[in-house]
Amino acid sequence: MKKTKTILFAVLLCILMCFTACQSKMVESTQHATDRVFTNKYMDSVKGITSTDYEGYWMPEKILWFEMSGKDQGYRGIIYIDEAEVQRLMNDYDDWWLDTSALPSMKDVNLSSVQGSDWYCSNEFVKEFSTMLQIKDLRFNGKDAIIFDVHTF
């Protein structure tokens, strides 16, 4: 009888643990889906603006990845671009960057540390782009990404 109770207790404990694990996965999956919807919404906005729309201003022709993160006061966005885009950007638009050779890849950077740095992009394109998406501090890191902050939707 005691052995049966022990086995029954173990089975119930196992079921409870499985249920908890499944519930945790469901919450995680839902959160990821919410983030993806948000990201896709802004990715569509970015894709909708091309270099032909703003003649003379730079816009990536090929975007590798787009990320948004943050809440409350604002969001940090990163547009990852391929090597050809980086070369085109550095060759054609010197005013986008100063000395970024010492900067690591954005994948290794603490994003809070880049705000207010000396590689702020200040050309006319920023003003146009910022107005449309309420973006501040659009910057190029000189390696693989463009970083921007979005405030107050």
Model-derived features: positions:
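Bacterial N-terminal signal peptides that target proteins for export
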Residues: 1-9
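C-terminal motif of bacterial Sec signal peptides marking the signal peptidase cleavage site
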Residues: 18-21
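Bacterial signal peptide processing site
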Residues: 23-25
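Phosphate/anion-contacting hairpin/loop surfaces
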Residues: 28
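Short aromatic-glycine motifs in intrinsically disordered, low-complexity regions
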Residues: 31-46
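Mature extracytoplasmic domains of secretory-pathway proteins
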Residues: 45-119
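Extracytoplasmic electrostatic interaction patches
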Residues: 91-153
